């Protein structure tokens, strides 16, 4: 728990003024609650027994005042703690995504997307509960316990000893329950992440599932995951919910003893009826915040586990360390010197590129040839520094690639692949992605990509909204938008990875002509199985099983 608050202390410090309000309002709630129980004594002794009419006129207002203070304090406490919780969660979520976006591609290849989504949504939700609800309730209930204990001791120190003995007796079984809950909470969150990963996989591949008649297979797999989640959840509840009944039972024993001993004290005249009922009311009310605190500590175990899962990401350093040199000049040369690249597969390294030595230069059009899996895309990934070579070195303009900042490197490179990224936004926003919108330039790039004609026929032209993944476009239209985006970036290195595979012959010829026009002062890399596209190349590079066979 100490580590938990240490991790979030920098966020909590930003809200110290709000915490002062929370502390003050919680104190008002505690005092109002204690005062309310104390008022039982004058109600019975002064009004019902002594028939004091003056007190009869005053006491109802005092009761209203007590509950007004309690209600107002609870509202202020709830509002400010939720404000703190929401703000901290917002900042942690921002920090998590920032951290994730710095990770190397190998991290994303090894981690299920649903697992990451679960951490950035579900796990953070548990942190919010701990930093807002649990924190405020702990302060409020803790102060309430102090106030009620004060009333209990004030009314009868002797009976207080009997009534409060329950606290240390309950500590041993409660601590064992809490340790068990923490262990189950970890399994529960991991199971929840598996469900999220399964759903993410299904929704991302729903078309393939339908085509392959895989609905029943996927449903069966999901039912299995869901059943496991249910069983762990029930087990968690079965353990966590023991604490409240246990406190109720032990509390009932203490109250029974107090009634017996206190009744004798009243009969002997050692304590007034009002004082005894004030005591018993405070004692009854005391067990409620104790039970709530016990439940909070139990529920807090989930937040501790969630915090560990969140900080696994926040404290993880990217495997690819960014360089310090900003690439200001145009890219003139890209050189590979004895480069090897291995991917981890089933805890074993498998080389996808072996002993690659070659050089690309400005004003060249390079054709990367080879069968699927020969290493063409892996070569491109190394140029973009999405992966680090296992052995060997890569140079950009005779500078080691690892010395160059990733941002400045990627600003000089545009890539168009078969997997086109279209997000929910206007055509203009998709083409100018990450850059300022210049309508004239956007239309020029759309024209070169043979996309302007169909865009202008859309309801709002370049301001027309595209659906997520571009589902309101054909495959060829999506590819042309991607080509226009690459052209808009005006990069010195253009990489086309099967970028014209979804285009008809006429459109493909027009796009190829645009590529030829871009050759001047640029380096263009073509990955294609289409012989007519490969004819554009001035240099051919062939890969077989990760090795160069033609250069």
Residue ranges of model-derived segments:
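Juxtamembrane helix-loop junctions of ABC transporter transmembrane domains
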Residues: 1, 24-25, 29-41, 45, ...
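Transmembrane helices of ABC transporter permease
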Residues: 14, 18-29, 61-69, 133-187, ...
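Helix-loop-helix
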Residues: 49-55, 61, 151-165, 235, ...
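Conserved catalytic Walker-motif region of ABC-type ATPase nucleotide-binding domains
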Residues: 100, 222, 310, 336-338
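An intracellular "coupling" helix at the cytosolic face of ABC transporter transmembrane type-1 domains
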Residues: 105-106, 122-131, 135, 139, ...
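Pre-NBD coupling/linker segments of ABC/ABC-like ATPases
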Residues: 317-329
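ABC-type nucleotide-binding domain
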Residues: 330-551
